[in-house]
Amino acid sequence: MRFLILFLALSLGEIDAAPPVQSRIVGGFNCEKNSQPWHVAVFRYNKYICGGVLLNPNWVLTAAHCYGNQYNVWLGKNKLFQHESSAQHRLVSKSFPHPDYNMSLMNDHTPHPEDDYSNDLMLLRLSKPADITDAVKPIDLPTEEPKLGSTCLASGWGSITPTKWQIPNDLQCGFIKPLPNENCAKAYIHKVTDVMLCAGEMGGGKDTCAGDSGGPLICDGVLQGITSWGSIPCAKPNAPAIYTKLIKFTSWIKDTMAKNP
C-alpha cells in the first residue's frame, strides 16, 4: 500500500509517515496556472504532508491518514517552494477525521488481508475563511456516482518518480480512468470496499503517489474522490490506485460542517 507507507516515511522524517499506503503524480504534467484553484497544500508545522480540497471558504477536505496536529494550509499555490502573490496561508482550528477510519493502521505494521483503509477522509476547519479569488475557489461535492469510461484528473505535489521521493515545485496533473473495483481487489492484499474508488491506467506509467494523499480526483469536471492509497512503487502495471469515494460521504461531510460553523 504505497501512499500510506510513503506518507509514514515522510512523517517520520522530514515530512511524516503513515501505514502501507502512499500517493503522488507519476507520468503527469505541470498543471496550467490556477487551473486547480480548489487544490490545497496541507502542512504540519513547516513540512508539506498532503494535498487537500477546498469545499467552501471555511473547510478543507483531505485524507484521514494525514492526521496529526499543528496543521496549516496554503491555498492558491501553483509552485510549492516559491512565493506567489496569489497564495493564501491559513491555520487550522480543528480537524475532524472520519469516526470510522481505523487510526491503528497509522502505525507501521505488517500488512494483513483484513486491513481495511475505508473511510479515509478528514475535514479541516480553517481559523479564518479563505478569500475567494481567481486562484482560490471551492469545488462542489458530487451528486452522483462516477461513471466508468469518464476522464479523471488527479493533481498533487507528490513524488514524480515511482521509487524515489522526488517532490516537484510545480503542481502536477495527470489524466487517469475510473476502473471497476475488481481491478484493484486483484492487485492488493488489503480490502477494497464499496466506499473506495479504483482509478488509474492498467498498463501503468500514470499514477498518484507519495505526497498526493488527500488531493482531488475530478472526473468529467466533478469532484469524485480524494487520493488514499496504492502500490509501491507507484505506476506499476495492473496496480491502479484507490481513492475515497466521496459520493458515499456527502451526508457526513455536510453534517460535520453544519455542526461546527
Curated annotation (Swiss-Prot):
This is Kallikrein 1-related peptidase b21. One of its GO terms (molecular function) is serine-type endopeptidase activity. Glandular kallikreins cleave Met-Lys and Arg-Ser bonds in kininogen to release Lys-bradykinin. Displays trypsin-like substrate specificity and shows activity towards casein, gelatin, fibronectin and IGFBP3. Residues 18-24 form a propeptide. It catalyses: Preferential cleavage of Arg-|-Xaa bonds in small molecule substrates. Highly selective action to release kallidin (lysyl-bradykinin) from kininogen involves hydrolysis of Met-|-Xaa or Leu-|-Xaa. It comes from Mus musculus. InterPro entries: Peptidase_S1_PA (IPR009003), Peptidase_S1_PA_chymotrypsin (IPR043504), Peptidase_S1A (IPR001314), Trypsin_dom (IPR001254), TRYPSIN_HIS (IPR018114), TRYPSIN_SER (IPR033116). The gene is Klk1b21. The lineage of its organism: Eukaryota, Metazoa, Chordata, Craniata, Vertebrata. One of its GO terms (biological process) is proteolysis. CDD domains: Tryp_SPc (cd00190). Pfam families: Trypsin.
